[in-house]
Amino acid sequence: MDRQTQTQLHDYLKSHHINGVMLVNGKGSKAITITNNETTNNKQLVKANRLFPTASLQKIVTGTAIYQLAQKKQLGWGTSLNTYFPQIDGSEDITIRELMNHTSGLVNNDRPALPLRGQKQQITYMLEHMRNDHVHTWDYQDVDYELLAAIISKQVHLSYNTYIHQRFAKPLHLNQIKDFSEVTPKQVPQPMDPAISWHQVTVTTSSDFGAGNLFMSPNNYWKFIYNEVLGNSKMTTEFYQQAKKQEVAYFGGVYFDGDIIRANGSIPGYNCCFIANYKTKKMVMLFSNNIDYLTLKAASDDLLHNYMGA
């Protein structure tokens, strides 16, 4: 990563008034942080070692865990949802593959009035507020990944969070990863939009079990993607093979575009994305607390074309 490119990326953040950090490749597996502050309020500064709600960037964590269970032959892409949740309407017609690529036909857009406490409450809420459209076309729904998280838990006889800690956080020494319930507002950059309350943030993250309940620092998220995703070419190849059969090339938590994988995360007050070349391991991430989803999408596209050269 040369100085000139770093300057260009910083200029991009500055000219678009993005309060946040970008992470790009440094030496080896390490990341270089590019920071732009649009505020002097320390409570609102985004930092590479400060917790940040992962939102949908968590889906690839869940997808990776599912892949590893598939490798151990504990489940397969064709395994029926009925195996784990026979009480769900139409579960016999839904496979793990369809949960991984958002073609399950399941929908759930409800949010609780109060944050859900613990995995049991999260699963109960999910099951009560779910409906089945019985169509197997692309529909980006968090509930697919909430179910995958619940399946992981049933399969390994541990809570989802405990399993993620044992499987990824411990071996990779990720010390900045917490469930929403363990996080205080002080530990997270507060949204720059005063209309967004901490209550909104906790309600959203608590009901995105497996698809946004975890907070991670940008550095820890980089470490996870670099080691567990980009470091596993067998998995990315398998995900690509699965994704390219679909109307939308998506599988396991990421979109595919040739050798590029990418994902966006968005909850009230927080937006983030990553784009990586899974062959060369070139990668860029963006975490911000003052832009909306449309600005995030535009920034992600700009990075894809101007930085990743895709």
Where are these regions (language model features)?
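A general structural signal for short secondary-structure boundary/capping elements
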Residues: Y67, E128-H134, V143-L148, A298-A310
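Short, surface-exposed loop or secondary-structure junction motifs
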Residues: E92-I260, N264-P268, C272
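Catalytic loop of the DD-peptidase/beta-lactamase superfamily, centered on the K-T-G motif
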Residues: M1-N36, T202-A310
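Short active-site loop at a secondary-structure junction
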Residues: I18-G20, N42-E98, R131-V143, F209-G212, ...
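A short small-residue
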Residues: N41-N42, V203
